[in-house]
């Protein structure tokens, strides 16, 4: 298969993924097929975002790493010493992706390390490994292009997370600002009583203790529930079960108290 055709396969993977959640496993499989090697996509902290095996490596330690989806911390940190593509590292290299305890079995093992860069930051590392056949220029072009695509997807995922965080915070702030002074006071007492993300509340007890009407508590809870910040369920005489759905709510409530 020609280089241009292989590049187009990577392109189509990117186009197919547009707007969908990132699937690093599919990315690894595509790169495996076009480069004909084992592929490991690592995050900055060594989490295995995706991988695909072309040539099996029968080794208990490697098997556990794949199951745990985590590469050793020391190895991951050492990868940051490689600022640009480093190809055809042999079994004796500290960066080898082959188990050194089986050096005799993987004597012909070659590893290529490609930094994943995005927005000027090191986002992770793309590791390629195979037996015997050296990685040639075409392989390295595809690997670097693949790393760029992976970097773009990591950045997109991060941007979506930041957007979701901002949206959650805005919803909470709007919900809290819709509360009257007495309703806000009631909510503060309710969540002091719950002491966590969920629990059972007896509205009449809090109303008596704080000196507010039960209807103020009911209205406050209704406003938060309609905003999707909490969910509540009446359990009759036992009280009302409350669960926080938006993880920004308790943080914002705490911030209000400290001001």
Curated annotation (Swiss-Prot):
Compartments it resides in: Cytoplasm
Key word DNA-binding present: yes
GO CC, one annotated term: cytoplasm
Membrane-spanning parts: none
Location (main, coarse): cytoplasm
SUPFAM superfamilies hit by this protein: Winged helix' DNA-binding domain (SSF46785)
Listed GO biological process terms: negative regulation of DNA-templated transcription
The keyword DNA-binding is annotated on this UniProt entry: yes
Region ranges (GAF domain): 1-155
Superkingdom to which the source organism belongs: Bacteria
Keywords assigned by UniProt, alphabetized: Cytoplasm, DNA-binding, Phosphoprotein, Repressor, Transcription, Transcription regulation
Coiled coil region boundaries: none
DNA-binding region: 203-222
Pfam families reported in the protein's UniProt record: CodY (PF06018), HTH_CodY (PF08222)
GO molecular function ontology, one term from the record: DNA binding
Residue list for modification Phosphoserine: 215
Function: DNA-binding global transcriptional regulator which is involved in the adaptive response to starvation and acts by directly or indirectly controlling the expression of numerous genes in response to nutrient availability. During rapid exponential growth, CodY is highly active and represses genes whose products allow adaptation to nutrient depletion.
Family the entry assigns: Belongs to the CodY family.
Record protein name field: Global transcriptional regulator CodY
Classification of source organism: Bacteria, Bacillati, Bacillota, Bacilli, Bacillales
Name of the gene: codY
């Amino acid at each position: 298969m020609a280089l241009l055709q292989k590049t187009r396969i990577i392109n189509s993977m990117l186009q197919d993924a547009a707007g969908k959640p990132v699937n690093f496993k599919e990315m690894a499989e595509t790169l495996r097929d076009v480069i004909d090697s084992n592929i490991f996509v690592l995050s900055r902290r060594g989490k295995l975002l995706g991988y695909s095996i072309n040539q099996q490596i029968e080794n208990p330690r490697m098997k556990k790493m794949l199951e745990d989806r985590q590469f050793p911390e020391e190895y991951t940190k050492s990868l940051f010493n490689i600022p640009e593509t480093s190809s055809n590292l042999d079994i004796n290299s500290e960066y080898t992706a082959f188990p050194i305890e089986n050096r005799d079995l993987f004597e012909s093992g070659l590893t290529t390390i490609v930094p994943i860069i995005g927005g000027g930051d090191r986002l992770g590392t793309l590791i390629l490994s195979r037996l015997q056949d050296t990685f040639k220029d075409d392989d390295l072009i595809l690997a670097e292009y693949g790393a760029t695509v992976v970097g773009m997807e990591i950045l997109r995922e991060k941007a979506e997370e930041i957007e979701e965080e901002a949206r959650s915070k805005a919803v909470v702030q709007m919900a809290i600002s819709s509360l009257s002074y007495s309703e806000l006071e009631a909510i503060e007492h309710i969540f002091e009583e719950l002491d966590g993300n969920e629990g059972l509340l007896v509205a009449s007890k809090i109303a008596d203790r704080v000196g507010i009407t039960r209807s103020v508590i009911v209205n406050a809870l209704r406003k938060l529930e309609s905003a999707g910040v909490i969910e509540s369920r009446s359990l009759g005489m036992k009280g009302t079960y409350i669960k926080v759905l938006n993880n920004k709510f308790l943080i914002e409530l705490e911030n209000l108290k400290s001001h």
